[in-house]
Amino acid sequence: MTIQASSGPSSALEAVLADLITVHHELLQLVREHRVAISRNDAAAIQELLSRQGMLGVRIAALEKARGEAIRAITGSARAGITEVLSKVEAGDRAGVAAKAEQLRSVLMEVQRQNGIVRAATQSLLGHID
């Protein structure tokens, strides 16, 4: 994690978003490996990948807490949406925060899509067991 003292709440938010992007890319890679392990019916690999995904979940939770704190520093509410956040950050910081938020949204959508594929593959495998 690169959470560190920064020149202001906008910089802190941008750093947290960058870390969230990195961790979610790591998660995406694990989900893809999970899909391959399912296709090979490799129980040991599946177990190991689930464990690693769980560890990333802990990192994501810590980053989400930091993200909420940065958003609270900007807007007064940890749950403010990106539109409100962007309306309250300084103009010079707006483009960077918006770009990171969009990158995070994009990787989250891909993680969700890949998780759907893994879920379907798991159900298919379980169907063969029944």
Describe the function of each predicted region.
Residues 1-36, 43, 47-130:
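C-terminal-biased regions
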